Amino acid sequence: MALPAEISVSFDFSSGATFGYPLTLGDAKYGLLGTGTLAASEVPEPVVDLTPDVYSISIRRGRNIMRDQYEAGTATVRVLDPLSYFNPQNTASPYYGYLTPLRKLRVAATYAGTSYFLYSGYTTEYRYTYPQGQETGYVDIVCNDAFRLMQQAAITTVASATAGQDTGTRVSAILNQVTFPTNMRSIDTGNTTCVADPGTSRTSLDALLNAAYSEQGAFFINSSGTAVFKNRTNTITSASATPIEFNQSGGIPYKNLVFAFDDKLIINSASMTRVGGSAQLAENAASIVKYFSHQTNETNLIAQTDADALNIAKIYVATRAETTIRIDAMTVDLLDTAVPTGTMLGLEYFTALKITNKQPDGSTIVKTLQCQGLDWNITPNQMQVTVTTLEPITDGFTLDSAVQGIIGTSVLAY
């Protein structure tokens, strides 16, 4: 059965973090201003199409529910290799001498004339296998997204990271410090101001996640490889968008709902300490009586004042003091003709989702959630995505919202 979208896998042998084709003057393909990327010429052709030899694709991206933060997106692409092109010691290979770690790989899907990136990352491992009794070997190309680059880049001081700048400006300063490409950023202006950079030894990823936490926003790498920083306001209001409906009668069909009803995500006591400040405590007494104490403690936040730290503690507890039945994940099969392919390919973090599930007794469970993870499994005969779904990571009151605009229920954010 043909897949509902045309899948392509491109492999870029050029160095650097930027995805794209190098600009080549006079070339019909690479000589387009605004399309080609300024880069040194390479041999072999910098970007090659691996699609004809791809056997399977596995992509894992999303927010870790228990750690409450985004993690590096990973991908494993299995490529059949009948001519041993991916053998790094094969001098006859056109890739000889260029097959190194941290080259760029992208997975895209094209549907109805529109292309969607499903993954953009950097190779970290080549697992070559020659199965016994088979004539054709294969290589598993293992990739991580730009979080890997940021985790490897240690920093002490950050240039231009002065007191009073907003968290979005601080995120940009950290990315500048590690020379992350400016054309691969989408940075909101922060709602919170920062202390001067503390000058401690840490990874750039730790510094970026600290800024996002101090904002109570989000920092992640999207499917096109862009570093995205969402401020608190946009994180909150994203939950009020018109949701995509998934159900068993007219909406997008699904399977394998993962239900949970437990205390794992409850936080009813939070202590937040900024750099140079004192611990600020917020608690929900009713939640503590009901569920016992569930505590969290964060230190060295870069929020500028103790009042900011207290607000972080308050909104963190307000968002997590209660629990209810959860839908943590669902699987959608794109081979099902009732599934709108373009809609599923366009999902990204913070997309609003409304899931309705009919129970055997005729009752229903209805949850309005957000997409916070996408796991793709693609072969010549399969195209499925498992969607991680979560309640909003930061609650707040939004006027005219049926979900976030309920007086007496919705959280008044700062």
Region locations from a protein language model:
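Assembly/oligomerization scaffold segments
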Residues: 1-165, 195-216, 221-223, 251-255, ...
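Acidic, small/polar-enriched beta strand-loop surface segments
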Residues: 1-51, 160-168, 206-372, 376-381, ...
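Helix-boundary capping/turn motifs
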Residues: 72, 183, 346-347
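Secondary-structure boundary/capping motif
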Residues: 76-78, 239, 386
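Short beta-strand-alpha-helix junction that forms the catalytic/metal-binding core
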Residues: 141-142, 385-388
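Fold-independent oxyanion-binding glycine-rich loops
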Residues: 146, 187, 232
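N-terminal export/assembly leaders
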Residues: 151, 171-199
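Generic structural signal for short, solvent-exposed loop/turn connectors between secondary structure elements
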Residues: 156, 179-185, 277-279
